[in-house]
Amino acid sequence: MASSSLLVTIFLCISVFFFSSVNANEVTVGGKSGDWKIPPSSSFSFNEWAQKARFKVGDFIVFKYEAGKDSVLQVTREAYEKCNTTSPKASYTDGNTKVKLDQAGPVYFVSGTEGHCQKGQKLRLVVITPRNSAFSPGPSPSEFDGPAVAPTSGAAKLAGGFSVVFGLVLGLWAFFF
């Protein structure tokens, strides 16, 4: 009897982990072309691209670029606005950078190559908190400077709600049987 409860508990933990990670997305900067480089024309803007996408806490943003010739810097709003690359929050140089978006609010990235930010190789995106997560931290008041993005889709809310209910049912079943 105890071994079946242990198996159910292990299954419960795996299930909750699986269903909570199902909602995370990987979004490549720039869309299908996926290149982190100076925009080829003034008609393309990384910020306009980002406004058409939805980023939520737990998602990953992926930057693809030539390692050794470029880099990605996560910076403050002030550094983003001035294209200041001297004191980044984080620096990435591997050519295939995957950054987890772990906090709601605006996030700022610029190229670490001199002169590239001034030519438009910079990105501001807004990360939203999924409605099915009550524990994600909000943005700090000094960092948040833009409007909120619309809430997540009904499918994401349904999947999150299902994982909570499923976990509770399995937990109760394991406890009593």
UniProtKB/Swiss-Prot annotation:
KO phenotype (gene knockout): No visible phenotype. Plants lacking ENODL11, ENODL12, ENODL13, ENODL14 and ENODL15 have a reduced seed set due to aborted ovules as a result of pollen tubes failling to rupture and release their sperm cell cargo.
Domain Phytocyanin: 25-129
Gene3D superfamilies on file: Cupredoxins - blue copper proteins
Main location: membrane
Covalent lipidation (GPI-anchor amidated serine), chain numbering: S153
Keywords: Cell membrane, Disulfide bond, Glycoprotein, GPI-anchor, Lipoprotein, Membrane, Signal
Annotated tissue distribution: Mostly expressed in seedlings, siliques and flowers, and, to a lower extent, in roots, stems and seeds, but barely in leaves.
Propeptide: 154-177
InterPro entries in the cross-refs: Cupredoxin (IPR008972), ENL_dom (IPR041846), Phytocyanin-like (IPR039391), Phytocyanin_dom (IPR003245)
Disulfide bonds: C83-C117
Topological type in the membrane: Lipid-anchor; GPI-anchor
Signal sequence range: 1-24
Gene Ontology terms: cellular component: plasma membrane; secretory vesicle; side of membrane
Glycan attachment residues as annotated in the record: N84
Annotated compartments: Cell membrane
Entry's Gene Ontology molecular function annotations: electron transfer activity
Alphabetical list of PROSITE patterns matching this protein: PHYTOCYANIN
Function text: May act as a carbohydrate transporter. Required, together with ENODL11, ENODL12, ENODL13, ENODL14 and ENODL15, for male-female communication and pollen tube reception and burst at the synergid cell surface of the female gametophyte.
Assigned protein family: Belongs to the early nodulin-like (ENODL) family.
UniProt-recorded name of the protein: Early nodulin-like protein 15
Organism: Arabidopsis thaliana
Gene for this chain: ENODL15
